[in-house]
């Protein structure tokens, strides 16, 4: 059974490995210090090094993951510190030194931080692992999602409407996002392939026959309307607008959109377009992302004060 402590924020610290630079010429050192310039690969330590005011070179930076337990002893509460401050400080110092000795065994390269968060598998004998939340255990991996997208693209059927969808994956999963119909048509693709597609061409103005068919569709879609041909209906006006629809004979043919305005027709068709992507597609948290769903599934890391370690040789 997994430990409940895996969902708690973890603490970590950086260990900076460095080495001293041999002074070949003292004059060059003094001239460099007087000019105030320094190289990006070197730094001047103030009070953190055994040899202050000396130049050192960075060797590597290691990320150390601490235990999930408290860094200090939990027995020393703020109220106990007021009554027994000396004893508590002694316990804190001893516990801090013991924790510091354990840091070397829980270290990794700082560039492996992202892989550590997402790829380490839990162990029943070790409660220091980093894993996903229990509610996200059903989320498939990136490889599984890529295979699923290949099947979706293979089985894609061209719809009757000319619609091209260019948006991000998060927008495809949101039912509130509407898309404008375009001239070109493309199969479901990722944001990268959609960005490489051709530019969208505006729709042409609908001709007379398409406008009449559209009015008939509006009649059939209304609950209280009867299927009637626009040519045989009395008072038929193909270019009817929303401003001159006062008569009862032409009120059934006019709707909230303007037939003479193609932009309103586009807006009406857009609101009734079903998304090509399913809304229940799993999220992929194995790729870097700054959106809300990734921050929710990430683990909070509290960084302690960095340590410095001198490398000899």
UniProtKB/Swiss-Prot annotation:
Region (Disordered): 24-53, 190-291
InterPro entries recorded: DUF4667
Top-rank taxon, per record: Eukaryota
Biased composition (Low complexity): 239-260
Biased composition regions of type Polar residues, renumbered to the chain: 211-229, 261-284
Species for this entry: Saccharomyces cerevisiae (strain ATCC 204508 / S288c)
The protein's name in its UniProt record: Uncharacterized protein YMR206W
């Amino acid at each position: 059974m997994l430990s409940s402590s895996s969902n708690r924020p973890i603490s970590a610290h950086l260990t900076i490995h460095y080495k001293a630079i041999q002074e070949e010429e003292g004059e060059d050192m003094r001239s460099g210090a007087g000019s105030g310039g320094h190289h990006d690969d070197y730094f001047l330590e103030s009070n953190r090094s055994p040899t202050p005011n000396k130049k050192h070179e960075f060797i590597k930076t290691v990320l150390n993951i601490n235990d999930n337990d408290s860094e200090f002893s939990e027995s020393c509460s703020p109220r106990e510190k007021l009554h027994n401050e000396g004893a508590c400080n002694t316990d804190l110092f001893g516990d801090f030194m013991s924790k510091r000795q354990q840091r070397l065994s829980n270290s990794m390269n700082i560039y492996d931080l992202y892989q550590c968060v997402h790829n380490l598998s839990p162990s029943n004998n070790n409660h220091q692992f980093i894993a996903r939340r229990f509610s996200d255990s059903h989320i498939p991996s990136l490889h599984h999602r890529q295979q699923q997208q290949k099947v979706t693209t293979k089985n894609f059927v061209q719809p009757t409407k000319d619609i091209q969808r260019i948006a991000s994956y998060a927008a495809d999963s949101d039912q509130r996002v509407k898309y404008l119909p375009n001239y070109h048509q493309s199969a479901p693709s990722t944001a990268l392939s959609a960005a490489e597609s051709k530019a969208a061409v505006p729709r042409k103005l609908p001709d007379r026959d398409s406008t009449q068919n559209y009015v008939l569709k509006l009649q059939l879609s209304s609950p209280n309307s009867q299927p009637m041909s626009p040519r045989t209906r009395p008072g038929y006006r193909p270019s009817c607008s929303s401003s001159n629809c006062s008569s009862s004979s032409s009120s059934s043919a006019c709707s909230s959109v303007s037939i003479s305005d193609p932009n309103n027709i586009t807006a009406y068709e857009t609101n009734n377009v079903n998304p090509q992507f399913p809304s229940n597609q799993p999220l992929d948290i194995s790729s870097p992302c700054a959106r809300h769903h990734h921050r929710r599934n990430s683990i909070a890391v509290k960084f302690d004060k960095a340590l410095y370690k001198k490398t000899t040789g």
